[in-house]
Amino acid sequence: MTKHIAILRGDGIGPEIVAETVRVLDKFIAQGLDADYEYAPLGGEAYDEYGHPYPEFTQNLCRKADAVLLGAVGSPQYDNLDRPLRPERGLLAIRKDLNLFANLRPAVLYPELANASTLKPEIVAGLDILIVRELTGDIYFGEPRGIRVLENGEHEGYNTMKYSESEIRRIAHVAFQSAQKRSKKVCSVGKANVLETTELWREIFEEIGKQYPDVELSHMYVDNAAMQLVRAPKQFDVIATGNIFGDILSDEASMLTGSIGMLPSASLDENGKGLYEPSHGSAPDIAGQNKANPLATILSLAMLLRYSLNDEARAQQVENSVQKVLQQGLRTGDIYEEGTKLVSCSEMGDAVLAAL
């Protein structure tokens, strides 16, 4: 049965990195992958065309699709729009609309990039962490929220942090099942000493953990976890955490690898449908200059093949091809160092295709 993929180019470098990734997808389709794809706008591109960052056309296409591939959203030119109309709101809206509750962000350090990390090679060599972040709850979506005027005339901003038992249960299962395929360790991260939300989180993880006796469960406060990621990151296998803590920790973990331009991500629903995107932003400063690193987006396609199309063989083919071009010494500007060859976005795409 043909799988349908919605492709959202987005803003900034989004169209460039997506173009290189689609070339890989086209090659697989030509070789017999039973899939097709259609483009739709999201973010600033969608606002320009439809007046909304997540328009009805895009909603309908994404709801019908088996998987969604996204470039990046956001650009300073939209900063003065009302908050609900800004490009980033399109990303929040699609996650909520498709009920993409589980965000998987690998932080893997390729041996060829060991010197690109800001940490000493002996601390990060062989790093392979997976951060499992809950995406649709927590303080980003909690109500009530807003800015109000107090009786004394002072303005006050307020937000609501909350998690239901069912929300925690389903993300816990994703974390434990992910760990079973890896090194069988889950570290649950929160702030249970001061936040009731994460106190409940810890209790539920303890309960669910009993269903996975082969997986070792530990707990860590988020401030300590942030420190340990820099001090001794290889102690971690799967880190499971809520929306706001996961947002921060996954960006921190990404820099252990030397470049956020290397890191893919998957956001999944309960049935394996997913949104796949690079972990980096839209980099408007280099947009349209053929300088962007397409590898995180190409690796996001590998995750799409693995999780939504159940095609492990092609997923590994993509990952092996990326490793091969790194072994050949090819580098975009973000991962370039002396002794390697600086290439453009499209040249990196050429190299991955050749390696396939």
From Swiss-Prot:
Residues reported in the UniProt entry to bind substrate:
R95, R105, R133, D223
Protein's UniProt keywords contain Metal-binding: yes
Cofactor binding remark = Binds 1 Mg(2+) or Mn(2+) ion per subunit.
Q: Which UniProt keywords apply?
A: Amino-acid biosynthesis, Branched-chain amino acid biosynthesis, Cytoplasm, Leucine biosynthesis, Magnesium, Manganese, Metal-binding, NAD, Oxidoreductase
User: Main site of residence?
Assistant: cytoplasm
Write down the superkingdom of origin. Bacteria
Pathway the protein contributes to: Amino-acid biosynthesis; L-leucine biosynthesis; L-leucine from 3-methyl-2-oxobutanoate: step 3/4
Which residue stretches, if any, does this entry annotate as coiled coil?
none
Q: Which cofactor does it need?
A: Mg(2+); Mn(2+)
Q: What is its EC number?
A: 1.1.1.85
Give the matching SUPFAM superfamilies: Isocitrate/Isopropylmalate dehydrogenase-like (SSF53659)
Which Gene Ontology BP annotations are present? L-leucine biosynthetic process
Q: Which reaction does it catalyse?
A: (2R,3S)-3-isopropylmalate + NAD(+) = 4-methyl-2-oxopentanoate + CO2 + NADH
SMART domains in the record: Iso_dh (SM01329)
Which amino acids does the record list as binding NAD(+)?
G281, S282, A283, P284, D285, I286, A287, G288, Q289, N290, K291, A292, N293
Marked site positions, Important for catalysis: Y140, K191
Q: Where in the cell is it found?
A: Cytoplasm
For this record, the Gene Ontology CC terms, alphabetical, are:
cytosol
- GO molecular function annotation: 3-isopropylmalate dehydrogenase activity; magnesium ion binding; NAD binding
Manganese among the record's keywords? yes
What does it do?
Answer: Catalyzes the oxidation of 3-carboxy-2-hydroxy-4-methylpentanoate (3-isopropylmalate) to 3-carboxy-4-methyl-2-oxopentanoate. The product decarboxylates to 4-methyl-2 oxopentanoate.
* Protein family (similarity comment): Belongs to the isocitrate and isopropylmalate dehydrogenases family. LeuB type 1 subfamily.
Q: Subunit info?
A: Homodimer.
Q: What is this protein called?
A: 3-isopropylmalate dehydrogenase
What is the source species?
Neisseria gonorrhoeae (strain ATCC 700825 / FA 1090)
